[in-house]
């Protein structure tokens, strides 16, 4: 409304105009402008087709016992078809999704539930957004859905920390490997490829000609030429996908890395972060607008938690190349990896009570190392270069490159980027390269505080070190050490892969009676996290380098942390793609890289008869193959195998724990991974 009034006043009430308007006439014209704006808004609301509002809630009073509304499975299938029809037949039109808990309106009458039909009015009048008659708008009513896919049985060999006598020593003893070994059985699906249409993505980036494209285009000046010569697939690659399930919106949100290279996918010149949305069936949705919380905008519309401070909403559009501020110099590219590396997406719970997706990534930047000035105030500034760890709040923004550039730069100060912050080790101790980390959230801290105040990193996987970093503000505060096994520092060959999922949180989300046997046995003060690391083995018997996932189980007992289990290479029956499509599997790199855990749910087993159904857990995680794919793999029964199998569960749930100084299980896992590589090379 303010924008409309300003525009109206500028056009009709310019004081420099030859037409001298009286104050009375100005007021009349202002009133006329307000009337016209209201009339136009009303016409949009009235004329907007009810066919483009998915039916659902009606206006009913709400109470403290209000629970989020979701449609039944039959209705959800019907709504899904409507959305897919709209995506297919209304190209270029938006699909606008309000969160499921967008329900409370507070006014002089009290609180009531906003009708679905009122979403249009809110969007046009309160948010002051334009609406096309063919746009589709709805409040989410979709719940998570497992795909109906085949599974095959797979074995995973793991090595425990020793747990019992002799486990608390940093001296590795691989003679113990057979004794520490245990094998679990899970089931895994084939890899489902989710790569986007790079030609479409880059064409949109080129045609939109955003400030971000104009800023970075010197790194890929031949983009138009690549279209003309049809060589996009020789210079551009998409990989390293990481996703989260947005429960309030009923969609998967994915970030992936898109690189430009002059040679092949192993020599990137610049990296971009690409954000896109998939429905619950893993079908990509185009031109999707999510109505997300905006804590900077206080509003009378709130989420269901009446104890939280009211906040407004704003819209974010997907798919998009994320405008993340990065340091770059197109005149100095040798040996530098500019842009966004290894992006991971994770959900944090904010102080306002809602879940917010954030990105964790590495990026090349510089920091001032020395300043030299003479008496005439002329001098020289020296810089050190780093590949550091950052967080990006993708639903929040900042102007310019604060928290990145130390020198003022007027060229970028008015650009609106995603809000970022660098994570720095204690005592401002930046490592030259911060790439080998595994992210996790402390669930007990969330329960005690009601929100997440920190994120945690397994910063070094062998001779374990845990870093704790604040996310409550955007100040460049130093992180602090949560745990250090010892003073040994070396990244080693076991690197971070996916984030780690908190098992306590996973169990807490479900009330199946079958889970009580696990919940009741978890000792007080004990937390578990599970995810996939990745070992990088050079010249081990297949190509110059082999990567595979390594399952890891992180345990916290009191104030101490350890890897209770580390597995050798895990294949999971996933098809391998050769680095060079016209050559063998052991030419150059042979890899499966785990990137992120998309979801982990506990359901009634879909593959059993109704009367025989038991609870089963399903993990979805993303991988990359040949640094050129974005794939999703489902693993069935991993939680069950870890916590109900007689061997592993006995160790994980034991009250007395040792092994907090042991690295033997890591060495055993790496030793057997090398054996895996050698046998694989002899086979292929």
Swiss-Prot record:
Residues 1-28 are cytoplasmic. It is found in: Membrane. The gene is BMT1. It is a single-pass type II membrane protein. Disulfide bonds: none annotated. Its main location: membrane. This is Beta-mannosyltransferase 1. Beta-mannosyltransferase involved in cell wall biosynthesis. Required for addition of the first beta-mannose residue to acid-stable fraction of cell wall phosphopeptidomannan. Plays a key role in reducing host inflammatory response. Residues 50-684 are extracellular. InterPro entries: BMT1 (IPR021988). Disruption phenotype: Impairs the mannosylation of beta-mannose chains on the acid-stable fraction of cell wall phosphopeptidomannan. It is an enzyme of class 2 (transferase).
